[in-house]
A protein has these predicted regions:
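Short, acidic, small-residue-rich periplasmic hinge/interaction motif at the N-terminus
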Residues: 33, 44-48, 81-85, 99-139, ...
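N-terminal periplasmic accessory domains that precede
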Residues: 100-104, 146-149, 188-191, 217-239, ...
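Short acidic/polar hinge/loop motifs at secondary-structure boundaries
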Residues: 146, 180-207
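Transmembrane beta-barrel wall of Gram-negative outer-membrane proteins
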Residues: 247-275, 279, 289-335, 365-367, ...
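Outer membrane beta-barrel strand-and-loop segments of large Gram-negative receptors
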Residues: 294, 426-430, 470-475, 586, ...
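Face-selective signature of the C-terminal outer-membrane beta-barrel domain
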Residues: 305-329, 356-515, 543, 547, ...
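Outer-membrane beta-barrel signature, preferentially recognizing the C-terminal barrel domain
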Residues: 358, 475-483, 529, 558-606, ...
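Surface-exposed extracellular loop regions of Gram-negative outer-membrane beta-barrel proteins
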Residues: 509-514, 546-592, 607-626, 747-762
């Protein structure tokens, strides 16, 4: 009932907005023509304010005419652009009714070469509310997955191939084209691994999202913008590549775009064929016993995926669109672990445990669909409505053997077989409304999401003649979660000052239902929760000088547990170590404040403080009265994080440019595993990333990049040693109109990207070290194709700009 009341109140509120938003509207009109006096349709019309920020965009109609209706008084500039023509920029004028008459655009020479490469952007661009890493401009971010390309983004670090961090803090919300994935943890990483980097235009790292976006993400938000061509006609790209590290890998991606009049159709297909290898060791002393192990892990899964969609302009005000994404990961896998077991105070080995996991069946299938409707009129009113549906089907079958030997003689065998299936069903509805109000911009909206995760685990002891079910480890778990959200947000410019304030309400209803057998009878364990949270956000900025600005932002954030972390199933890694979820896990809540200075769109200096309650992390913990170690998530206490960051773009000369990103951060954990084990740990750490681009003779471009991480505190009480990586890439464009691009890249030249960490408390010591296949040689070729009828792109910047603003 509470949710219904909230929805009715807000819908009633929407109906009254227009009464408050009627202000004095001024009309700007004109007609755009070419040198032959013919009308230019689909020219992009932009109105810029005194800070040179776009406040209104539209396109000319079939007669080349445009009309802007705007109500916020001030000084403005009119900018008109069209592919194949020189840009027109008016003199500064006060907002009033005004006709610009005929505006003639002078033509500029244009061929396919210019269509492909025009508007060249820096590798890293700095915007007031975001740092943008332009993946399509990077030499060594091509021919890999989105997951691998994300490692190159400034401020981003992926810890031990499983946790994405931003500016030294975990809890990052990932969006794709401004839309939430509804996935986290291993499922999100699988999704990123199935996306080719060639389909990505840029990563946008957003430090302080407004109330318009989900409150998830204590560290901020990363929006992945996919490529979508603006060229009329049929065009696309084909990328093929070979990667070699320990084994050979083959990468293939093809994408196309067809644009004609009001219709745009796009699609893509990609696959990754090859094995991935990992090597990791551990050295553990637990209750006086030594466990020294070495693991070789081979992931034999293949990746395949595709996308198809369309956008259709019904008229100048109404647009509809839809797309379908399919991602598949399938194949086998093998881990082989040798563990020497002995006494912690000597080098004498009592036993050797040889464990093998044969993942003879693995699959991950994800289908996601979206339907979008957009209305935008000349009064500044925008309506967006999204319907999302997705399914996530994951399953694996594993045969595990544990063979114990004493003095090279087999003393015991434990053989297991497990079947695990996860089916996740995701539904989402979202409504956003924007209008001019009191010489500012008012935004409000509603969102509803429904998640159902069905999990089925079967565990068997393999005997000589049959498999015997292990009731203790065989169970089903169903998790349902429904979130209803509503928000309001207002932003306004007052001379040199800009303010933004918002409030988001999210009500979460969830229940976990565990079914298992105990003494031959079925048992149930329910974990219901219902909670409502309010998430205020506020920012204020001032344009201190012509070239610099200063801003202060605050927001409250939430990080709900991932679905695997809530799943109480037991997953055996071997006889002496296993993973288990925690259905009692609570969301962690974070207060976050950021002070930021921006200079000339080339420098950002930031100072951020975050305070997290109910801090949660995965911990390694010894099981009492046994020699088994368990890896599980727990709510631990409080984490405080303060960070200082610097991002600097620099053009040294006409052939050398560089981008630097550095973060120094201090983490303080006041946490407890239980009432007897408390930790009060503090660690100062640094991360630096330098990327350099060189223009060389013979149409060559070189890229040299390096990343360094100092000693740091990760998770609750795990201290990791420093590591680093250097990559080098070479690129050359050739064929007619530079349609072909050939790249040669060497990643992690000296194999410095290895992990090495230690954690300890009384009676327990654990050291982990190893590496994934980071050192690789990659060769890939990209070919761009287009039909010969290209006259220039149909400008859809108004729609794209609004999607872009959704990530700010």
């Amino acid at each position: 009932m509470k949710k219904v009341v909230i929805l009715l109140v807000l819908l009633s509120f929407f109906n009254k907005l227009d009464a408050f938003s009627q202000e004095v509207v001024r009309n700007l009109t004109g007609q755009v023509i070419d040198e032959k006096k013919a009308p230019l349709k689909f020219a992009n019309i932009a109105l810029l304010d005194a800070a040179h920020k776009s406040v209104f965009q539209t396109n000319t109609d079939s007669l080349g005419q445009f009309k802007i209706a705007f109500s916020i008084a001030g000084k403005y500039t009119l900018v008109i652009s069209h592919s194949g023509y020189k840009e027109f920029k008016s003199a500064v004028f006060e907002l009033q009714d005004k006709s610009f008459g005929l505006i003639e655009l002078a033509s500029s020479t244009q061929n396919l070469k210019e269509v492909v490469i025009q508007g060249k952007a820096d590798l890293i661009t700095i915007e007031p509310n975001a740092i943008v890493y332009n993946v399509s401009k990077s030499v060594d971010a091509q021919g890999v997955s989105a997951f691998e390309a994300l490692r190159k983004a400034p401020g981003v670090y992926i810890d031990n191939d499983r946790t994405i961090m931003l500016n030294g803090k975990t809890g990052v919300m990932i969006l794709i084209d401004g839309k939430q994935t509804y996935l986290s943890g291993a499922e999100l990483i699988d999704l990123l691994k199935s996306m080719p980097s060639s389909s990505i235009k840029s990563f946008e790292m957003i430090n302080s999202p407004s109330a318009k976006y989900d409150a998830s993400g204590a560290a901020g938000m990363i929006n992945i913008k996919t490529t979508k061509s603006q060229i009329k006609g049929f065009n696309g790209t084909l990328t093929s590549g070979l990667n070699y590290g320990v084994t050979l890998k083959y990468v293939q991606d093809i994408s196309f775009n067809y644009r004609k009049d009001k219709l745009n159709v796009f699609g893509s297909y990609n696959h990754f064929l090859g094995y991935r290898t990992y090597v990791y060791d551990s050295y553990r002393i637990q209750e006086g016993k030594l466990f020294d192990s070495h693991t070789d892990d081979t992931d034999k899964r293949m990746n395949m995926g595709g996308r198809i969609g369309f956008d259709y302009d019904i008229n100048k005000k109404n647009t509809i669109g839809a797309f379908l994404n399919v991602a598949s990961i399938f194949g086998g896998g093998l881990t082989q672990t040798k563990t020497n077991i002995g006494q912690g105070n000597s080098n004498i080995i009592d036993q050797v445990l040889d464990a093998e996991n044969d993942y003879y069946h693995q699959k991950t299938m994800r289908y996601s669909a979206n339907v979008n409707y957009k209305y935008e009129d000349t009064l500044g009113r925008i309506i967006n409505f999204d319907v999302d549906y997705g399914t996530f089907d994951k399953g694996n079958a594993n045969r595990q053997s544990n063979i114990y030997s004493e003095q090279s003689i087999v003393s015991k065998r434990n053989l297991y077989r497990s079947l695990n299936d996860i089916d996740i069903d995701l539904k989402g509805l979202k409504f956003d409304y924007t209008t001019n109000l009191f010489k500012g911009k008012f935004e409000t909206g509603l969102k509803y999401s429904d998640i159902v995760s069905d999990n089925d685990a079967k565990f068997y002891h393999q005997l000589a003649t049959r498999d015997s079910v292990d009731d203790r480890r065989t169970s089903t778990y169903k998790y349902t979660e429904r979130v209803v959200a509503a928000y309001i947000n207002y932003k306004k410019s007052l001379g040199k000052w800009s303010i933004q304030a918002g409030l988001r309400m999210e009500n979460t209803s969830s229940e976990g239902l565990l079914r298992y057998l105990s003494n031959g009878a079925e048992q149930e364990q329910r974990t219901p929760r219902d909670y409502t949270n309010f998430f205020p956000s506020f920012s204020i900025s001032v344009k201190a000088t012509k070239n610099s600005s200063l801003s202060l932002a605050y927001s409250r954030r939430i990080d709900r547990p991932s679905y695997p972390d809530l799943n109480p199933f037991v997953y055996l890694l071997d006889d002496v170590s296993y993973w288990q979820g925690n259905p009692d896990l609570l969301p962690q809540m974070t207060h976050r404040a950021t002070l930021q200075y921006v200079y000339k769109s080339s420098t950002i200096i930031g100072l951020t403080y975050a305070h997290t309650d109910q801090y949660s992390s995965r911990v390694n913990d010894g099981v009492p009265n046994s020699l088994v170690v368990i890896f599980r998530p727990l709510n631990l206490g409080v984490q405080k994080n303060i960070s200082f960051s610097l991002t600097q773009n620099m053009t040294v000369n006409d052939w050398w440019s560089l981008s630097f990103n550095g973060t120094v951060y201090r983490v303080h954990n006041d946490v407890a595993f239980d009432q007897f084990r408390n930790f009060n740990l503090t660690q100062t750490a640094a991360r630096m990333n330098l990327q350099q681009t060189f223009k060389l003779p013979f149409k060559l471009t070189a890229e040299l990049s390096g990343a360094f991480n100092s000693k740091r505190l990760i998770g609750a009480n795990e201290v990791a040693r420093g590591n680093s990586q250097v990559d080098i890439g070479l690129q050359r464009k050739f064929l007619k109109d530079n349609r072909g691009t050939l790249r040669l890249v060497v990643n992690d030249i000296y194999k410095g990207n290895q992990f090495n960490s230690v954690q300890s408390y009384e009676g327990f010591y654990l050291k982990n070290y190893g590496y994934y296949e980071s050192r690789q040689v990659r060769v890939n070729f990209t070919y761009r194709f287009a039909d010969s009828s290209i006259k220039g792109p149909r400008s859809r910047n108004s729609s794209l700009e609004n999607e872009n603003n959704r990530t700010r």
